Regions:
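Cleavable N-terminal export/targeting peptides
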Residues: 1-22
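Short glycine/proline- and aromatic-enriched beta-strand/turn motifs that initiate or cap beta-hairpins
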Residues: 19-60, 108, 120-122, 128-130, ...
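Predominantly the C-terminal beta-signal and adjacent terminal strand-loop region
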Residues: 30-41, 69-81, 126, 138-197
Length: 197
């Protein structure tokens, strides 16, 4: 956790010294697939959480039209199932390798792919009576890892080198559940708008 926070601080410092730093606000939808295997029989359930994300990144030129955009962000998602409210808050560090194409003098298209390192801060459930469960609690029979690694890609458009419209999809590579016989993976869809300084 400390290493990821340190990396995020370094990226923020590096971005602050750049003329291409982008601040973004967006929507995310996280789809979580949980599988449980017992006696050779596997059952599965998929749930989704929706929320907001804010981030900052810097698109650094590598060569020609090839760039890399390291960044740091945070997201907050919620869902309700009956009288139970679920919420998740986390930090993430994307490293998006991208290639740009000029569509016109004012419009440019970038396609990107890369990893995202995700660190969960809060993941809990609370009912109407105030009973609360922290899914990162190691004493739970079914508890979760705070760390996740996602791979994905997408595209963004920049207008007059100031406005950015971005869409992406990332697939979780790790089983985030620590309990025996469980496999839980997350996929994330995101749409955002950003301003380039």
């Amino acid at each position: 956790m400390k290493k990821l926070l340190f990396l995020a601080a370094v990226l923020l410092t590096a971005g602050a010294a750049s003329a291409q730093i982008t601040y973004s606000l967006g929507y995310i939808s996280t789809s979580t697939k949980a599988e449980y295997t017992l006696g050779g029989i596997t059952s599965s359930k998929t749930t989704s959480m929706n929320g907001l994300t804010i981030s900052v990144d810097d698109n650094i030129n590598l060569t020609g039209d090839l760039n890399v955009a390291p960044g740091v962000g945070m997201d907050f998602s919620m869902r309700k199932d009956g009288d139970i409210k679920y919420k998740k808050f986390g930090l993430y560090v994307p490293v998006d390798f991208n290639y740009g194409f000029a569509l016109s003098s004012n419009l440019k298209l970038f396609v990107y792919a890369g990893p995202t390192f995700d660190l969960g801060i809060i993941k809990d459930a609370k009912d109407d009576n105030g009973n609360k469960v922290n899914y990162y609690d190691k004493d739970l029979v079914v508890n979760y890892s705070r760390f996740d690694l996602l791979l994905g890609g997408g595209a963004w458009l920049t207008f007059q080198d100031q406005l950015r419209f971005k869409v992406g999809y990332k697939v979780g590579m790790l089983n985030t559940c620590k309990a025996d016989n469980y496999t839980v993976k997350n996929n994330v869809l995101s749409v955002s708008v950003g301003y380039i300084f």
